[in-house]
Amino acid sequence: MTRIVGIDLGTTNSLVAYMKDGQPCVVPDRNGRAMVPSVVALTDNGLIVGDSAKEHLTRNPERTVYSVKRFMGKGLTDVQSELAYFPYQLTETGGVIRIRLGEKTYSPPQISAMVLKELKRRAEAYLGESITKAVITVPAYFNDSQRQATKDAGLIAGLEVLRIINEPTAASLAYGLQKHTQGTIAVYDFGGGTFDISILKLKDGIFEVLATNGDTHLGGDDLDRLLVDLFIGQIQEQHGIDLSGYPDHMQIVRLEAERAKIRLSDDLKTKITIELPNDKGHFTRELTREQLESLAIPVIERTLAPCRMALKDAGLTPKDIDEVVLVGGSTRMPLVRHRVEALFGKAPHCHLNPDEVVALGAAVQADILGGGTTDMLLLDVTPLSLGIETMGGVMSSLIRRNTTIPASAKELFTTYVDGQTGVDIHILQGERELVKDNRSLARFRLKVPPLPAGVPRIEVTFLIDANGILNVTATDMRTGQSQSIEVKPSYGLSDTEVERMIEDSFKFAADDVNARKLIEARLDAEALLKTTNKSLTEAGHLIAAGEAEGIRNALSQLTTAKDAADPRTIRARMADLEQAAKHLNVVMLDDSLRKSLQGKKVTEVT
């Protein structure tokens, strides 16, 4: 049976998971790390993804892309207020956001596909088999455009996306599998760039989503920005430096803000140290948890309104909730947990790793689709109402939000003008009454014979599949003529573009693998050169002159090999250097131990 993996494609980090002996497990890298930073960087050697790309955030910020999930299925006008926070260049072509990296531009699905390819490669290396099918998670409040963009990313990465599943729902699957529980649960999902709340009923292996709500532009990134604005303002005030003109230092500030936020989940205070440009020294200050929380309160309070709305839509009160499950790294903040407990009147469930639980649940759903797990059934819902434009610029909803999917709905419409020869079907998504306040998904035209107004009968059918993606058919009931469309997002990619990207991914697959091997070898070589040079400088006097000269020769040979285009040669010279420096490393360790024990009594070290 072909293995199907579960993927959590996150704003900050992404993970891939699989089922082993009936339990979901995340796939680690060779260093045991499960999370792949959702970062892509363009280097002189090509595109890199993950941890190695993250290192370029401060080195080369204009050519390093992060938080691309915030742009999925969106146009430039949707994210106008955020542009100042991103050092890389964003443009728009045909309503699609494009991200410039060097001479080329990429759409958000293309960047996301690079992250998915890395997850695919990691899973294949770990499991020892080809991976071609996956379940990918999205925020529950992602609209049709964003879901289609995610599916496009999977296709470009060479994955057959069997199911798009909502992140809170995935988390509930992992939770239900572990706890074997019954009852009503609330899944509070506060990630890097999005927030979701879902209310589910668990009974006899059936996971029924009762209601969902959220904000696809609310997450840990927003907390980081509060600190960034604070630090930048204080640097301007104290040192007279406007960091907005220094993209590399802006990234240093952003990363320090993120690290400080994380530290303050465990500590009551932390020290902030930020290097200033042009050798102007450092900005330092102490930041307390209380100060962070005073800044964060408005952001965290914004998560509570969707919670109340979801409860209302489900016809429940906080007392009806049996368990609250926390998902997403941002839920590690003590203030978040305190506010969630205050809202629901019970301490949240914190035993599952909030960073991994979504990927684990996706693996469970993948196993269900593959026929491995047969005693669990998932009944998800559509997060937003779907409908069409009617006379006067009003939206008529056919499928209401929180309807269990897959779902279908039909409604009859007619013409309003005598002799009308066609009907324009304008498909919308949203909760507002007027067309202008909702999101336009697609338009198409149905031809009708010229008849008096009100005579034609046009049946419009909406069919939303288990991925939350919509198909619409309009039929003239008098003639039987119909017109159908699979709704493509206004800010999405055309079929031709996606097909071209998929063809390119296969066409250049071998070149991509070789380029990747070369990039990885060069990066590893640079790291080895740096550490060995440092060791030789600090401890060269502890070894014989001839041995030190041998290390220098090996360093020189690796430096030369690093610029070649053969990863095997680079790896061979790395092995030579590691062998040449083996005794130096032992001597350094002995010297370090000797210094640490110097002057101590036996009783102090036993």
PLM regions and their residue ranges:
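Oxyanion-binding/catalytic loops of NTP- or PPi-dependent enzymes
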Residues: M1-G95, L101-M114, R121-T606
